[in-house]
Amino acid sequence: MVDKCLFKLSDQFPEHTAGFHVDLGLKPYGSYNSSKWSPVRFNRVLTNVGNGYDQKTGVFTAPFSGLYIFHLHFIGGLHKQKTELAIFAGGEAMAVAYADGYDVDTNDQGACTAVVDLVMGEKASVKIYFGNPLLWASNLVSFSGVLIHSD
């Protein structure tokens, strides 16, 4: 009876786990400049289960095939210019976040989420999609991803 219960319980958890959470660091002021179409290299890695995120390149490589969820949050719109960042996966923009600084202050927030089916070895990253490449360089700019179901 105990063996049956343990077997059923083990079926409830995925065989593979992978996830990461990265940001642009703890420095409260300053800016991060990235060229358009180049991955943003998040310099502080808070979590990297499965070692899929490469801090040197800013690219996540899927360690397992399956369904992933990615989330991006950023402060942009510096100097009253709009900024668009995109979550790229499998070679295309899956979600785009927008921020501008046209309101009272000169900063704005953008966020987006993408649910993507990746094959082991496929890549995901954040890239400047349009506009001003300056980002607020702090822990307020973050990117994360989690394997929610493995194939």
Please annotate each region the language model reported:
Residues 1-151:
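Extracellular jelly-roll beta-sandwich "head" domains, especially the C-terminal globular C1q domain
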